[in-house]
Regions:
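Cleavable N-terminal export/targeting peptides
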Residues: 1-26, 164-166
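Transmembrane beta-strand segments of Gram-negative outer membrane beta-barrel proteins
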Residues: 21-37
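Residues that define the transmembrane beta-barrel architecture of outer-membrane proteins
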Residues: 25-27, 44-48, 79-85, 114-118, ...
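Repeated loop/turn-to-beta-strand initiation elements of outer-membrane beta-barrel proteins
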Residues: 27, 60-66, 95-100, 128-134, ...
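Outer-membrane beta-barrel "beta-signal"
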Residues: 28-30, 92, 126, 151-166
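Membrane-embedded beta-strand positions of outer-membrane beta-barrel proteins
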Residues: 29-33, 52, 66, 87, ...
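Transmembrane beta-strands of outer-membrane beta-barrel pores
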Residues: 33-39, 68-74, 93-95, 104-110, ...
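Glycine- and aromatic-enriched membrane insertion/assembly motifs of diderm outer-membrane
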Residues: 42-96
Length: 166
C-alpha cells in the first residue's frame, strides 16, 4: 500500500512539473515509429514507418512542425516503400501533456503513387525528465487519391526532446 501511494505521488509530481514545458520560443525534435501492425486501412497486411519531426512554439501551447518519414507497406500493395514530407500544427490542451494535431502530408512512391493526405492526431507527451518525452499518439490519414484503399488509422510511438532557446 505504501509503495502504491508513493508511486501515485511520484506520478502526480511528474504531471505537475510538466506544466511549464510548452512555452513560446522553444524548439522541438522527435523521432517516432508508426504502424507496426497497429494500424488499419483497406489493403495492407503490414506496415511500419519511421518519422522525424522538428517544431517551434509560436506561442504558449501552439507549435508548428515539419516532418520527414519513410513507410514500408506489405500485402498486395504495388508501391511498398513510400516517402513522406509534411507540415502540421499541434495544440497542447491546458498544459497537461495532451495534444491535438492537424496537418497535411505528401506521400510518394515509385512514380506511380502520389497522394496528399490531411492528417489528424491525438497524443500525450509524458515527460520522463525536464525535456525528454515519450509520446504515444493515435492518428488518422485521409487519402485524397483513394479513400477506401489508402486512408489509414494507426498508433504512433515517439521520443521527443523540448529544447530551450533562451
Amino acid at each position: 500500500m505504501i509503495k502504491k501511494l508513493f508511486m501515485l505521488m511520484v506520478a502526480l509530481a511528474t504531471v505537475i512539473t510538466a506544466s511549464a514545458q510548452f512555452e513560446q520560443g522553444k524548439t522541438y525534435i522527435s523521432a517516432s515509429l508508426s504502424g507496426l501492425d497497429l494500424n488499419y486501412n483497406g489493403t495492407t497486411k503490414f506496415s511500419c514507418g519511421l518519422e522525424a519531426k522538428g517544431g517551434y512554439f509560436l506561442e504558449d501551447d501552439l507549435m508548428v512542425l515539419a516532418n520527414l518519414g519513410y513507410n514500408h507497406v506489405g500485402g498486395d500493395d504495388p508501391s511498398p516503400d513510400r516517402f513522406v514530407v509534411g507540415a502540421m500544427g499541434r495544440y497542447y490542451i491546458i498544459q497537461n501533456g495532451i495534444y491535438l494535431g492537424v496537418g497535411m502530408n505528401y506521400k510518394h512512391s515509385n512514380h506511380k503513387y502520389n497522394d496528399f493526405m490531411p492528417t489528424a492526431e491525438v497524443g500525450y507527451a509524458f515527460f520522463i525528465n525536464r525535456t525528454v518525452t515519450i509520446e504515444p499518439a493515435i492518428y488518422y490519414e485521409q487519402s485524397l487519391k483513394n479513400h477506401s484503399k489508402y486512408s489509414n488509422v494507426g498508433l504512433r510511438l515517439g521520443l521527443g526532446v523540448y529544447l530551450f532557446t533562451n
